[in-house]
Amino acid sequence: MGRCCFYTAGTLSLLLLVTSVTLLVARVFQKAVDQSIEKKIVLRNGTEAFDSWEKPPLPVYTQFYFFNVTNPEEILRGETPRVEEVGPYTYRELRNKANIQFGDNGTTISAVSNKAYVFERDQSVGDPKIDLIRTLNIPVLTVIEWSQVHFLREIIEAMLKAYQQKLFVTHTVDELLWGYKDEILSLIHVFRPDISPYFGLFYEKNGTNDGDYVFLTGEDSYLNFTKIVEWNGKTSLDWWITDKCNMINGTDGDSFHPLITKDEVLYVFPSDFCRSVYITFSDYESVQGLPAFRYKVPAEILANTSDNAGFCIPEGNCLGSGVLNVSICKNGAPIIMSFPHFYQADERFVSAIEGMHPNQEDHETFVDINPLTGIILKAAKRFQINIYVKKLDDFVETGDIRTMVFPVMYLNESVHIDKETASRLKSMINTTLIITNIPYIIMALGVFFGLVFTWLACKGQGSMDEGTADERAPLIRT
């Protein structure tokens, strides 16, 4: 009986160890899990991935912060601007995909991304319909910019003088965000009906969409899940100088493909930024107990380098690191994009304005992604809208203002997975962990039987050494 147990334990140990190593090397269970996820994470009617893509379940909040100008007269005399940050004014975003149509045997899908904003009073510092902000007169600066290359130059100069326009104006937060009827734009509208008489930083962006998209469904490859193929009927942009800079890369930022590795560079096309950007792995995180890869927008995105020379408009006119001139895609308005408080920008942009306090915690853009599913667990998209200003002798409105990139406002668009959704996702992830760890469980059993085998071997050797009383007796007795 003992000898039988001895051989059984040894055989089982050897078989289990060989089996576990074979399964690990062949990645049998890992491949099975990966294939299962690849089949589930695809835009197809009836899949959970499609439902979440069409109507994102997680709440998205956008916080708007404004820079209130406190010394307008001194600025016009050439002194350093002083601004005070006012905010947040928080809005909940209501998002959904509409006009959905499948094409190309289910490998592509077209849609528009609708977005509406609902004010959240309890998460805001005040009432946007009442609170006043003093800032640059962006419509005036825009028409001044138009006058530099526009046939309406003489008309614009005459209108600004006749209507005594000032460089700084005061409006409510609601007006600055969603629009107000501007006097100068209304006059120009008479000559140019295509120019709206209304101005707002997010005018016509509440309850609307940012254009027509064609996405890949991931049917042909999980790596193509929700990648953008076309935007507004174009496969590339036409604003920038080089073909590389005009490429539309990656997703719209609402979703990513599953089975992400930390060595991957992920691409995103945020249409409000007028260009594609990329994010890189930064650190390991845990969100609601779920594992995540933290990806960040690196400083190189807006660095003054040869790789970004194609974004300098006009050609060769690079403003410096940390800022992007997007006037070419904003109807000629002298809008400069940056990160909040000129985070990661050249120091001269920060020191030019009194009231800039850039810091990583509040001003960087990041996204925490569960690498197994590609689901976003937590994210913060942050960018700042600035205006390029300079003194122009032909326009008394500019006074003796310094040439600078002047901050107007910034936003923080954030999302955080809730406990209920996290619990469901955690259950699914734990199940996959059990499956992928089966080879290790088999290996542990192999080690256990190996220990039993060793114990039986030692016990058997001990028994042989001790022997019986007769065996221990001397052969010759006296």
UniProtKB/Swiss-Prot annotation:
It holds the Pfam family CD36. Glycans are attached at residues 45, 68, 105, 206, 224, 249, 304, 325, 412, 430. Belongs to the CD36 family. One of its GO terms (molecular function) is scavenger receptor activity. Residues 1-4, 460-478 are cytoplasmic. Interacts with GBA1. (Microbial infection) Interacts with enterovirus 71 capsid proteins VP1 and VP2. Changing residue 475 to I: Some loss in the efficiency of targeting of the protein to lysosomes. The gene is SCARB2. The keyword Transmembrane applies. This is Lysosome membrane protein 2. Acts as a lysosomal receptor for glucosylceramidase (GBA1) targeting. Disulfide bonds join 274-329, 312-318. It comes from Homo sapiens.
